[in-house]
Amino acid sequence: MIDPVLEYRLSQIQSRINEDRFLKNNGSGNEIGFWIFDYPAQCELQVREHLKYLLRHLEKDHKFACLNVFQIIIDMLNERGLFERVCQQEVKVGTETLKKQLAGPLNQKKIADFIAKKVDLAAQDFVILTGMGNAWPLVRGHELMSALQDVMGFTPLLMFYPGTYSGYNLSPLTDTGSQNYYRAFRLVPDTGPAATLNPQ
Protein backbone atom coordinates (compact mmCIF):
# COMPACT_ATOMS: atom_id res chain seq x y z
CA MET A 1 0.00 0.00 0.00
CA ILE A 2 1.25 3.48 -0.90
CA ASP A 3 1.87 5.78 2.07
CA PRO A 4 0.47 9.17 0.91
CA VAL A 5 2.56 11.25 3.34
CA LEU A 6 5.72 9.46 2.26
CA GLU A 7 4.74 9.83 -1.39
CA TYR A 8 4.46 13.59 -0.93
CA ARG A 9 7.84 13.74 0.81
CA LEU A 10 9.40 11.67 -1.98
CA SER A 11 8.00 14.09 -4.55
CA GLN A 12 9.86 16.96 -2.85
CA ILE A 13 13.33 15.38 -2.98
CA GLN A 14 14.35 16.55 -6.44
CA SER A 15 13.51 20.20 -5.79
CA ARG A 16 15.34 20.11 -2.44
CA ILE A 17 18.44 18.64 -4.06
CA ASN A 18 18.40 21.38 -6.71
CA GLU A 19 18.49 24.13 -4.07
CA ASP A 20 21.78 25.91 -3.36
CA ARG A 21 21.49 25.14 0.33
CA PHE A 22 21.89 21.45 -0.59
CA LEU A 23 24.35 21.72 -3.47
CA LYS A 24 26.50 24.48 -1.96
CA ASN A 25 25.69 24.10 1.75
CA ASN A 26 24.25 27.62 1.75
CA GLY A 27 22.52 28.52 4.98
CA SER A 28 24.02 25.64 6.94
CA GLY A 29 26.63 27.64 8.84
CA ASN A 30 29.82 25.68 9.36
CA GLU A 31 28.07 22.32 9.56
CA ILE A 32 28.98 19.60 7.12
CA GLY A 33 26.54 19.04 4.24
CA PHE A 34 25.15 15.68 5.33
CA TRP A 35 21.46 15.05 4.76
CA ILE A 36 19.07 12.26 5.73
CA PHE A 37 15.82 11.16 4.13
CA ASP A 38 14.19 8.89 6.69
CA TYR A 39 11.18 6.73 5.94
CA PRO A 40 9.19 3.84 7.46
CA ALA A 41 11.07 0.58 6.92
CA GLN A 42 7.89 -1.13 5.75
CA CYS A 43 7.77 1.32 2.82
CA GLU A 44 11.11 0.19 1.38
CA LEU A 45 9.61 -0.92 -1.95
CA GLN A 46 7.80 2.40 -2.37
CA VAL A 47 11.08 4.26 -1.84
CA ARG A 48 12.98 1.99 -4.23
CA GLU A 49 10.44 2.58 -6.98
CA HIS A 50 10.63 6.34 -6.55
CA LEU A 51 14.43 6.21 -6.51
CA LYS A 52 14.44 4.74 -10.02
CA TYR A 53 12.41 7.72 -11.23
CA LEU A 54 14.45 10.22 -9.20
CA LEU A 55 17.84 9.03 -10.42
CA ARG A 56 16.78 9.21 -14.07
CA HIS A 57 15.78 12.84 -13.64
CA LEU A 58 18.79 13.86 -11.55
CA GLU A 59 21.13 12.44 -14.21
CA LYS A 60 19.95 15.13 -16.63
CA ASP A 61 21.42 18.00 -14.61
CA HIS A 62 23.94 16.59 -12.15
CA LYS A 63 27.03 14.45 -11.87
CA PHE A 64 26.60 12.27 -8.81
CA ALA A 65 27.26 8.82 -7.39
CA CYS A 66 24.50 6.60 -6.02
CA LEU A 67 26.01 3.88 -3.84
CA ASN A 68 24.26 0.86 -2.36
CA VAL A 69 25.94 0.28 1.00
CA PHE A 70 24.97 -3.40 1.05
CA GLN A 71 26.62 -3.90 -2.34
CA ILE A 72 29.70 -2.09 -1.05
CA ILE A 73 29.94 -4.62 1.80
CA ILE A 74 29.70 -7.48 -0.70
CA ASP A 75 32.40 -5.90 -2.88
CA MET A 76 34.70 -5.43 0.11
CA LEU A 77 34.29 -9.04 1.19
CA ASN A 78 34.77 -10.30 -2.37
CA GLU A 79 38.01 -8.34 -2.71
CA ARG A 80 39.34 -10.21 0.30
CA GLY A 81 37.92 -13.57 -0.78
CA LEU A 82 35.64 -13.67 2.27
CA PHE A 83 32.13 -13.41 0.85
CA GLU A 84 31.30 -17.11 0.45
CA ARG A 85 32.77 -17.92 3.85
CA VAL A 86 30.77 -15.11 5.47
CA CYS A 87 27.52 -16.41 3.93
CA GLN A 88 28.22 -19.85 5.37
CA GLN A 89 29.10 -18.39 8.75
CA GLU A 90 25.85 -16.41 8.96
CA VAL A 91 23.84 -19.62 8.63
CA LYS A 92 25.92 -21.27 11.37
CA VAL A 93 26.29 -18.52 13.96
CA GLY A 94 23.58 -15.92 13.21
CA THR A 95 23.73 -12.24 12.34
CA GLU A 96 24.71 -10.85 15.75
CA THR A 97 27.70 -13.16 16.14
CA LEU A 98 28.68 -12.53 12.53
CA LYS A 99 28.58 -8.79 13.18
CA LYS A 100 31.14 -9.20 15.97
CA GLN A 101 33.36 -11.34 13.75
CA LEU A 102 33.26 -8.72 10.98
CA ALA A 103 33.88 -5.74 13.27
CA GLY A 104 37.46 -5.57 12.00
CA PRO A 105 37.07 -6.22 8.24
CA LEU A 106 33.95 -4.05 8.01
CA ASN A 107 34.60 -1.26 10.46
CA GLN A 108 33.05 2.03 9.39
CA LYS A 109 36.36 3.73 8.60
CA LYS A 110 37.31 0.94 6.20
CA ILE A 111 33.92 1.26 4.48
CA ALA A 112 34.39 5.04 4.16
CA ASP A 113 37.91 4.58 2.78
CA PHE A 114 36.64 1.95 0.32
CA ILE A 115 34.01 4.40 -0.95
CA ALA A 116 36.66 7.11 -1.34
CA LYS A 117 38.85 4.68 -3.28
CA LYS A 118 36.08 3.66 -5.66
CA VAL A 119 34.53 7.09 -6.28
CA ASP A 120 36.13 10.46 -7.09
CA LEU A 121 34.11 12.20 -4.40
CA ALA A 122 35.42 15.70 -5.12
CA ALA A 123 34.21 15.42 -8.73
CA GLN A 124 30.60 14.70 -7.72
CA ASP A 125 27.87 17.28 -7.22
CA PHE A 126 26.66 15.03 -4.42
CA VAL A 127 26.60 11.40 -3.27
CA ILE A 128 23.50 9.31 -2.48
CA LEU A 129 23.63 6.29 -0.17
CA THR A 130 21.00 3.54 -0.31
CA GLY A 131 20.80 -0.06 0.91
CA MET A 132 21.05 0.79 4.60
CA GLY A 133 18.24 -1.58 5.52
CA ASN A 134 19.94 -4.59 3.96
CA ALA A 135 23.30 -3.57 5.44
CA TRP A 136 21.97 -3.31 9.01
CA PRO A 137 23.20 -4.30 11.59
CA LEU A 138 26.63 -4.71 9.97
CA VAL A 139 26.56 -0.99 9.14
CA ARG A 140 25.02 1.66 11.39
CA GLY A 141 23.94 4.93 9.83
CA HIS A 142 25.37 7.27 12.48
CA GLU A 143 28.71 5.45 12.57
CA LEU A 144 29.09 5.40 8.79
CA MET A 145 28.24 9.09 8.42
CA SER A 146 30.74 9.97 11.14
CA ALA A 147 33.45 8.00 9.30
CA LEU A 148 32.52 9.61 5.98
CA GLN A 149 33.17 13.09 7.37
CA ASP A 150 36.88 12.41 6.93
CA VAL A 151 36.61 11.60 3.20
CA MET A 152 33.69 13.60 1.77
CA GLY A 153 35.32 17.02 1.79
CA PHE A 154 32.78 19.62 0.61
CA THR A 155 30.66 17.14 -1.38
CA PRO A 156 27.09 16.90 -0.03
CA LEU A 157 25.89 13.48 1.10
CA LEU A 158 22.30 12.21 1.17
CA MET A 159 21.50 8.98 2.99
CA PHE A 160 18.18 7.20 2.50
CA TYR A 161 17.47 5.79 5.93
CA PRO A 162 14.81 3.18 6.80
CA GLY A 163 13.91 4.28 10.31
CA THR A 164 13.38 7.60 12.01
CA TYR A 165 15.57 10.67 12.34
CA SER A 166 14.60 13.36 14.83
CA GLY A 167 17.24 15.87 13.77
CA TYR A 168 19.54 14.51 16.46
CA ASN A 169 18.89 10.79 16.87
CA LEU A 170 18.80 7.96 14.34
CA SER A 171 16.61 4.96 15.17
CA PRO A 172 17.08 2.08 12.71
CA LEU A 173 14.19 0.24 11.06
CA THR A 174 11.37 -0.23 13.60
CA ASP A 175 13.69 -0.17 16.64
CA THR A 176 12.40 2.95 18.35
CA GLY A 177 14.28 2.01 21.53
CA SER A 178 17.66 2.45 19.85
CA GLN A 179 18.66 6.09 19.57
CA ASN A 180 22.02 6.98 18.08
CA TYR A 181 23.10 10.62 18.15
CA TYR A 182 24.08 12.20 14.87
CA ARG A 183 23.73 15.80 13.71
CA ALA A 184 22.67 16.20 10.08
CA PHE A 185 19.91 17.88 8.09
CA ARG A 186 16.58 16.21 7.45
CA LEU A 187 16.00 16.67 3.71
CA VAL A 188 12.18 16.63 3.66
CA PRO A 189 10.63 16.79 7.14
CA ASP A 190 7.07 15.83 7.98
CA THR A 191 4.50 18.60 8.21
CA GLY A 192 4.28 20.51 11.47
CA PRO A 193 6.94 22.25 13.57
CA ALA A 194 9.72 20.09 12.08
CA ALA A 195 8.91 21.17 8.51
CA THR A 196 12.12 23.09 7.94
CA LEU A 197 15.31 22.12 6.17
CA ASN A 198 17.44 23.03 9.17
CA PRO A 199 16.59 21.15 12.39
CA GLN A 200 15.88 23.37 15.37
Swiss-Prot record:
Induction: Transcribed at slowly increasing levels as cells progress from lag to exponential to stationary phase. Pfam families: BrxB. Belongs to the BrxB family. Disruption phenotype: No methylation of 5'-GGTAAG-3' in chromosomal DNA, BREX no longer confers phage resistance. GO terms for biological process: defense response to virus. BREX systems (bacteriophage exclusion) provide immunity against bacteriophage. Part of a type 1 BREX system which protects against dsDNA phage. This system allows phage adsorption but prevents phage DNA replication, without degradation of the phage DNA. Methylation of bacterial DNA by PglX guides self/non-self discrimination. It comes from the Bacteria. Keywords: Antiviral defense. This is BREX protein BrxB. InterPro entries: BrxB. Disulfide bonds: none annotated.
